[in-house]
């Protein structure tokens, strides 16, 4: 089954400056602020059609408030461009002329 979930996220631009002389600074001084979560919670939905031996629950984050700060990899995807999976990845059965393919 595909299930549509609407949630809120943190996104946007933060004021930042690029430092000259990057070769002489530690890597920790080179990080820039990003729009990230100040406070968030998790909501859980039940996925229909799961087998009885499978827990039919999916939890997802909901942004309560945002801030400009360092990206925390404990709960955020901090890469430049995330993998785009805006489609249902479960294999679908296609029917052509009454026959399943």
Swiss-Prot record:
Record's GO cellular component terms: cytoplasm; extracellular space
Pfam families attached to this UniProt entry: Cys_knot (PF00007)
Function: Indispensable for the control of thyroid structure and metabolism.
GO molecular function, one term: hormone activity
Record keywords: Disulfide bond, Glycoprotein, Hormone, Secreted
The protein's name: Thyrotropin subunit beta
Gene3D superfamilies (UniProt xref): Cystine-knot cytokines (2.10.90.10)
PROSITE patterns assigned to the protein according to its UniProt record, in alphabetical order: GLYCO_HORMONE_BETA_1 (PS00261), GLYCO_HORMONE_BETA_2 (PS00689)
Matches recorded under SUPFAM superfamilies: Cystine-knot cytokines
Disulfide bonding pattern of the chain: 2-88, 10-66, 14-68, 71-78
Source organism (scientific name): Phodopus sungorus (Striped hairy-footed hamster)
Family: Belongs to the glycoprotein hormones subunit beta family.
